[in-house]
C-alpha cells in the first residue's frame, strides 16, 4: 500500500499531469484501488475492520515465541517442549501454531514459532498474556540462551 500510495501521490506534481501504471495479478484488490486513488481513510477503515474480525492489534495483544537453531531436530524438540508445557489456555488467549516460520531457514538457523493472541476485552493492558507466556517459558525448562535460542517478540511488527 505504502509504495503505491507514495508513487501515486508524487505523480503529476508539476504542470504536466502524471500517471502511475500498476501491474498486478489482482488488479481489483481493494488495497491497490485505495492506494491508487489516494484514499487513505477508506483503506484505514477496511484494514481496521479486517483486523477486528481477525482479532489482531489494536483489538488484541500478540506475542511471538520464536525458536532458532542450527539443528532442525533440536528446534522441533524445544518447540514441542513449549507446546506440551501448556496445560490449559486461559480464557481470551488463543494459540496459533507451532509452525515453521515463513522462511524456515534463515542465516543457517531453522526457525519455528508459536503465536499467542490475547483479546483486549479480557486483558486490557496485556498483563494476562505476559504472565501466561512467562509461565510457559519457565515450565518448559528451555535454556533461552543456548542452541536453540528463544526469541520473545511482544506485539511484533511482522509475523513472517
Each language-model region and where it sits:
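Substrate-gripping "pore-loop 1 plus following alpha2 helix"
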Residues: 1-3
Amino acid at each position: 500500500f505504502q509504495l503505491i500510495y507514495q508513487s501515486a501521490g508524487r505523480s503529476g506534481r508539476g504542470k504536466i499531469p502524471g500517471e502511475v501504471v500498476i501491474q498486478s495479478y489482482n488488479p481489483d484488490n481493494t488495497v491497490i484501488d485505495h492506494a491508487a486513488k489516494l484514499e487513505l481513510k477508506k483503506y484505514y477503515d477496511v484494514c481496521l475492520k479486517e483486523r477486528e474480525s481477525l482479532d489482531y492489534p489494536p483489538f488484541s495483544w500478540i506475542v511471538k515465541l520464536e525458536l532458532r537453531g542450527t539443528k532442525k531436530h533440536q528446534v522441533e524438540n524445544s518447540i514441542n517442549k513449549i507446546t506440551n508445557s501448556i496445560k490449559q489456555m486461559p480464557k481470551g488467549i488463543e494459540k496459533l501454531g507451532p509452525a515453521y516460520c515463513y522462511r524456515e531457514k534463515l542465516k543457517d538457523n531453522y526457525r519455528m514459532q508459536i503465536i499467542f493472541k490475547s483479546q483486549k476485552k479480557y486483558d486490557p493492558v496485556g498483563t494476562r498474556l505476559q504472565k501466561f507466556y512467562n509461565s510457559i517459558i519457565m515450565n518448559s525448562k528451555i535454556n533461552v540462551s543456548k542452541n536453540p535460542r528463544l526469541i520473545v517478540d511482544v506485539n511484533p511488527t511482522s509475523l513472517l
